[in-house]
């Protein structure tokens, strides 16, 4: 798994501060001065580790998205197929991501921040998630519950599927129709993943 660049308590305090700033005013209106003040550190301390607000927000998104994904993975119980663990974890991860307040704020106020990670390149959180997926896919190959295939390609295909649900689901749902609400689409996602993974 790709490590988060600033994974220690001082960095966490700074990332907590940038999260609070972004939730309050959005990314564009967040300044290094605001973050330093909230974190109780000098601006120079911030600039030694992060060149600008965008790099801070990038590390924040990595921390938050990876935590949401790993926190959504169900506990492995005896007799549980790895395929079910993957499908259930990915569906829960999409639900957690969609409910995340930082995701809502970025989509509502600064959606252009997500475009590079959808159209141009993978970010650190995507790389970390691909690593997690590759590991669990290998387990599924070994126990026979997941269709054999090129692990990295399978991981990337799964991430493409769940990203589309996480980022675009609200454009397809109809809250007043139980057949087209968010829960119905998450059930559909579960079926897609099951069919994709089954040998």
Locations of regions flagged by a protein language model:
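Hydrophobic alpha-helical connector segments
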Residues: 59, 72-103, 155-158, 186
